[in-house]
């Protein structure tokens, strides 16, 4: 029992202890709840963040559902981490606020647009400056033009396409200067090509500069490049042909824009540059040995000299003798110094003598002519030029070239370049110099050589005079002195001012200045009118040729008879129609060129009138059925002829009105009377001449209306009488007597005003006109022979073929 009681008490004690422990645990849980409450406060601070609130609510639910203390504590710790994360969310606000900073960046797009607009403004401004420079260039103000071009280049971007065009214009200015600045022009072309490598104008201008500098190989390279880029460029083709002719005349050949040398002959045996340098080395070794011997000899003689006496030491090398006195009382140091100086002097003299004695063999190649010569080592360019002059006496001014390691022909212009040619030819054997003939202005030594030649001739003659008479005059001495002074001062006294060239230059400049002015527009307009008139009259005359051809076709039918008459008539009709079509085409072209020339309208009306008569009488000759024949085309011919003749009358009246309004320009008449149709005219009375023209046009219009009335009558048209009455009115306007004309045709009328057979009695009409001309001298100025010529055209020879009767009634 006691044991049981003890066990029970022990269990109660354990139970009480466990309850105490549970109570302590519960207290810590309250602390957790208090912590959770503080977390709720934290969540309330970040109420604006929906995600954090949702997380906090979820944590509160977790706390209420916590079954164990460890889970709660772990949750609380996790909540602390969440709070720290929530607190870090405040840092995100400034990042969001930085979006406002993006607005100005977006606004910079407008700045980009403004920059693009600014670029367009710069380009337009540069083009304006370029146009101003072009105007100054046309006025020969090259400095002002280059200034404008320079301003345009400053405005444009460096890699803009317009820069190449402007620099090409600058190169043109340099080329036009006196004398031409071709080197600067080439530099500008290089800058233009650096922006646009395929700029044709820059390549052509650089080629012209190279040609002016006689660098034909470089000029040919640029021009061939232009030909490849633009095969149809006429200027490039012209320059290529010119360069080829120039190079071929000098014995050179062109193979695909590469200059080839002529075939060389077999080289004679001579000293090569390697042997030349070896020879020079032997001379130097020999000189060194001799100098050592001189030194030993001088030392030995120095030892034999007694102190109280003076001895003479002689050192002899080649042709030079060096004497040196050595005093006996001098110290050994001074004696040694003098010996060293003696050795150096002897060595230098021997070196100079050896170099002067050594020459090198060279070849001069001119076209197919190759000649040998000798040159001293390290000679000057002028010396080389003298040798060329001696070897080729017939040549005047030349350039001397050598072939470099790349195979290009390089012109030698300085002594340094001559040294470079010697270095590049060491591996080629005998040195070769290529002689190219140029103009005297391009050879800097030509003037000096000419003066030296004259001086030599003068000196020879002077010596001959001295030897011949034993004395000379002061004048000869003055002439010689003048030649020497001219050579030294480089004064060209023989050059005089060419007044003719200067006058022509000033004249051309003045003409260009006048041409570019506003006052030149009037003469230009008058010149344009004259050229238009010349072109229109040429086409007008060509139309006359076709009309004459059509009439000639018809005149060949006279005397034709037999069965083949109809075929020949048809062939002649078709050929005449073709000639009429060609004449009409030429007249219409003349009308487009010179629409205010009344002669064009008159010629076109006459052509349409003759074509209408040709078609109508061909129908009559062919005996076609007039009821089924389509006559609309012939009627249209008559209407067009009448319209054009009236138009010519209107243009003539307008010309007269213009002459009256501008009496000062009375001589500026665009269209005058054509001599072929009008014959001789009175130049002293323009009003009388105009009256004659109007009368002639009225008669031509009368003939058109009369022929039309005949056709309309045959076709049973009701308005034939109107055409006939209009023709009678025109006869009256032309100055004829209406009663006489009516009397002629009255025999053809019958009762009821029906036309039985209208025939134009040519002989009677001409007789009446002759009587009027004799009585009244044709107050309107139209002679009867002209009227006869016009009226005879009413029926061609095709309508008078034998054995063919034309029935009209």
From Swiss-Prot:
Function text: Carboxylate clamp type tetratricopeptide repeat protein that may act as a potential Hsp90/Hsp70 co-chaperone. Contributes to polar growth of root hairs.
UniProt feature, compositional bias: Basic and acidic residues: 307-339
Domain PB1: 359-438
Species of the source: Arabidopsis thaliana
Induction, per UniProt: Up-regulated by abscisic acid treatment, and by cold and salt stress.
Official protein name in the record: Protein PHOX3
Lineage per the UniProt record: Eukaryota, Viridiplantae, Streptophyta, Embryophyta, Tracheophyta
TPR repeat residue numbers: 126-159, 164-199, 200-233, 235-265, 274-311, 508-541, 563-597, 615-648, 709-741
Region described as Disordered: spans on this chain: 1-22, 288-339, 656-686
Keyword terms: Phosphoprotein, Repeat, TPR repeat
Modified residues (Phosphoserine): 298
SMART domains, A to Z: PB1, TPR
Gene disruption phenotype: Phox1, phox3 and phox4 triple mutants and phox1, phox2, phox3 and phox4 quadruple mutants show a 70% reduction in root hair growth.
InterPro entries: PB1-like (IPR053793), PB1_dom (IPR000270), PHOX1-4 (IPR044517), TPR-like_helical_dom_sf (IPR011990), TPR_rpt (IPR019734)
